[in-house]
UniProtKB/Swiss-Prot annotation:
This is Octanoyltransferase LipM. It catalyses: octanoyl-[ACP] + L-lysyl-[protein] = N(6)-octanoyl-L-lysyl-[protein] + holo-[ACP] + H(+). In the reaction, the free carboxyl group of octanoic acid is attached via an amide linkage to the epsilon-amino group of a specific lysine residue of lipoyl domains of lipoate-dependent enzymes. The reaction proceeds via an octanoyl-thioester enzyme intermediate. One of its GO terms (biological process) is protein modification process. Residues 32-240 form the BPL/LPL catalytic domain. The gene is lipM. It comes from Oceanobacillus iheyensis (strain DSM 14371 / CIP 107618 / JCM 11309 / KCTC 3954 / HTE831). The record marks K157 as: Lowers pKa of active site Cys. The lineage of its organism: Bacteria, Bacillati, Bacillota, Bacilli, Bacillales.
Length: 273
């Protein structure tokens, strides 16, 4: 018998609301108010999300953010910066004690990401986990280099994912780009010289890919969304039951957005959860 999970999908939201809703789901599951949950979401503006410990000063080009009318938000998870634009974003909240969650962070990620692997297969893309850790230090830009066990297609990183455990609950969320505006992405970072920017941009093209690039044609969001819903359902052996948020739940989301994801929380490391 398939286990029943909640499935949440809503209209595109701004950066603070999207991050606050992920955090709220973690709280609600910890309190037993919702079952394990899979969420799909989108962004109403291009957004650069930065890792919990990632520096802004000297790294992020705030003029570039303004130029491209992007939003900037700090995630509750670690890792490098991700440009969210033409993509499907997902999140999973589940208890650390759940039988599907390994005690090892790496193994838990590996197990949960099998649903992502299956979804790519349904789309006609063969992906695998990177089996060698990067020999270089962490980049400011996600997708520039795959970390150990992250997903790659023909050696190129195709999905960026991050995980955190708080109060006995695991939250994993990730970016599934259909396409990527690399010119915009590199305008959002500071570089010592234009030559270095161009070198890094070229290297990025060699190391990162997207769904559209792999399939050679533009895919509809609906096709990608359906593949990922099926992929997670099959591999995790779950039945997804759609839910909607109550007015009170939305109020809580807006409160979290204001307290934890406002502009005041961008420069320094925020303290929440």
């Amino acid at each position: 018998m398939r286990e029943k999970w909640a499935f949440l999908e809503n209209t595109p939201q701004d950066a603070a609301i999207n991050m606050a809703l992920d955090e709220a789901l973690l709280h609600w599951h910890q309190k037993g108010e919702i079952p394990p949950t899979l969420r799909f979401y989108r962004w109403n503006k291009p957004t650069l999300s930065i890792g919990y410990f990632q520096k802004v000063d000297g790294k992020i080009d705030l003029q570039g953010i303004k130029k491209h009318q992007c939003q900037l938000v700090r995630r509750m998870t670690g890792g490098s910066a991700v440009l969210h634009d033409d993509e499907l974003t997902y999140s999973i909240v589940i208890s650390e004690k759940h039988e599907k969650v390994a005690s090892s962070i790496r193994q838990a990620y590996f197990d949960l990401s099998k649903g992502i692997v299956r979804a790519y297969q349904l789309l006609g893309i063969e992906v695998d986990h990177a089996h060698e850790p990067s020999s270089k230090g962490r980049s400011n830009i996600c997708f520039e280099q795959p970390a150990f066990y992250e997903l790659v297609a023909k050696g190129k990183k195709i999905s960026g994912n991050a995980q955190i455990r708080k109060r006995g609950i695991l939250l994993q969320h990730g970016s599934i780009p259909l396409s990527m505006n690399v010119e915009m992405l590199f305008d959002l970072f500071q570089f010592p010289a234009d030559q270095m920017k161009e070198r890094k941009k070229q290297r990025f093209y060699e190391r990162a890919t997207t769904i559209n690039a792999e399939l050679g044609e533009k895919q509809s969001y609906e096709r990608v969304r359906n593949a990922f819903q099926q992929g997670f359902s099959e591999i995790l052996n779950i039945e997804l039951e759609p839910i909607t948020l109550t007015e009170e739940q939305w109020k809580e989301v807006y409160q979290i957005a204001e307290s934890n994801y406002s502009e005041n929380n961008i420069k320094g490391a925020v303290s929440h959860v």
